[in-house]
Amino acid sequence: MAGEDTRERLLNAAEQLFAEHGVSGTTLRALTKAANVNLAAVHYHFGGKEGLLDAVVERRATPMNQERLRELYELERSAGEGTPAVEDILSAFFLPGLRTFEREEPETIDLLTRLSARITCEPPEAIEALVRKHFGMVMRRFVEALQRALGELRKEVVNDRFRFVIGTLSHAFSGTFDLDVIPGHPVCDSSDEERIQHLIVFLAAGLRAPSSSHGVLEVSPVAVRRSGGIRKEARR
């Protein structure tokens, strides 16, 4: 019982400090002080800071990913011989995350939003294995579902576009999205669920957009000339 309490205190302290300072900016000394434990406890329960980060992500990601897979399974079962609509696949991916947040207190939602933003700002080599471990299989299932729903597109195109989906989702629920940075055009006062619905419509259209035989749309000569001029100016 005491061991479980120590473990939970370390996880809670890690969430708070990682959200405030980032993973690389948080020391073991700060973690042990915030959790009121000794250094040996970190190594005993997690093996070190990397193991602690892994447990922090696992605690939040596992229930959400299980719900995502359940929803996708139900979609595919209901579709029978057909394929679920792109919008429904996106909903199955997005909504479990939203429901996870809705079950939390506002302070925890803010904490988890900042934590997610902090983790994604870590060096890629520091988080690639972590993301692959906790989200790789789930994302693969959704990419495969989208590939079947978008059979007219090459698989590599769908792969790339799903990465755009992930990036857009991350930005839409980061603190920076709500900054009023466009004079005269304030941020829409919509609920998280409404924002998700807007996102789904927007992203489904992007996923369905046609591509050339090379996997990209043809760009007008004017745009090519302009982009070339921009690159030349940037090199000066």
Where are these regions (language model features)?
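Short, leucine-enriched amphipathic alpha-helices that occur as contiguous helical runs
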Residues: 3, 7, 11-15
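Helix-turn-helix
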Residues: 9, 17, 21-51, 55-63
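Short, residue-level hotspots on alpha-helical faces of the histone-fold
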Residues: 55, 59, 118, 122, ...
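Residue-level detector of well-ordered alpha-helical segments, enriched
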Residues: 56, 85, 89, 93, ...
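A short secondary-structure junction motif
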Residues: 63-67, 71, 119, 123-126, ...
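Hydrophobic alpha-helical connector segments
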Residues: 70-109, 162
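Amphipathic alpha-helical packing segments from all-alpha helical-bundle domains
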Residues: 88, 107-114, 121-150
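C-terminal peripheral helix-coil segments that are non-catalytic and often amphipathic
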Residues: 96-99, 103, 133-236
